[in-house]
A protein has these predicted regions:
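Conserved strand-turn element in the central/C-terminal portion of the radical SAM core barrel
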Residues: 113, 137, 141-147, 165-195
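Generic structural signal for hydrophobic
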Residues: 126, 165, 197-203
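Conserved SAM/AdoMet-binding glycine-rich loop
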Residues: 61-160, 166-167
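Short, electropositive alpha-helical surface patch
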Residues: 90-95, 185-202
């Protein structure tokens, strides 16, 4: 059996991807609205490389003998696997290519702060190793809402780090909460309209 800890979350568009556990939980774990990893007895944990390799071996058997189709994409599970150091991510990519050489891309959830930890050269190398299609929960471009919900970054940070991804050729998808401020008493009524304007300016 493959290692899966707690509730496994993935975007709808990753339904056909091979789900590979490389982290469990979230390094930030302070967003006021989020309860996705509340069922875990710890905040964040990295999977041992031997567990990752064992899961790839198991998945190889399952896909080739039972499911009968090739794997074109692998999705790393956990709230933000992209926080892992460059060397670790490259090791994981090496393992995925060893057992699934046909896999074209590797995706994951990522925080804006995870991208900030990587240099431009490292991001380009990660793209070359197959990392592409990151899902980033930016939620909003409104500074007050970002602070209130304790996201841990600013709207300017979102733009800066996503430009780094653009330069590296790494695609990404945003998760937006379109009414993030609308029902927030601290921000006042009608702020959802204001927020949409701020998001348009950011985009």
């Amino acid at each position: 059996m493959m290692h899966y800890t707690g509730t496994i979350w993935r975007p709808p568009y990753e339904a056909s991807s091979l789900l590979l556990e490389v982290t469990v939980g979230c390094t930030h774990h302070r967003c006021k609205f989020c309860t996705l990893y509340a069922d875990l007895p710890f905040r964040f944990r990295m999977s041992p490389l031997e567990d990752i390799e064992a899961d790839l071996k198991e998945a190889q058997k399952m896909y080739r003998r039972v499911i009968g189709r090739k794997v074109s994409r692998i999705f790393l599970t956990g709230a933000n696997p992209f926080v892992l150091k460059y060397d670790r991510l490259m090791e994981i990519a090496g393992l995925t290519h060893r057992y699934f050489p046909e896999a074209e891309t590797i995706g994951s959830f990522a925080r804006v702060t995870d991208v900030a930890l990587k240099s431009d050269g490292e991001l380009a190398a990660l793209r070359g190793a197959g990392y592409d299609g990151l899902t980033i929960g930016v939620e909003t471009a409104d500074e007050e809402a970002l602070r209130f919900m304790e996201k841990g970054y600013s709207a300017a940070d979102i733009l800066e780090q996503c430009r780094k991804l653009d330069q590296a050729g790494i695609e990404y998808y945003f998760v937006y909460m379109t009414e993030f401020r609308l029902y927030d008493r601290a921000c006042g009524e009608g702020q959802g309209i204001l927020e949409c304007g701020e998001q348009r300016k950011g985009i």
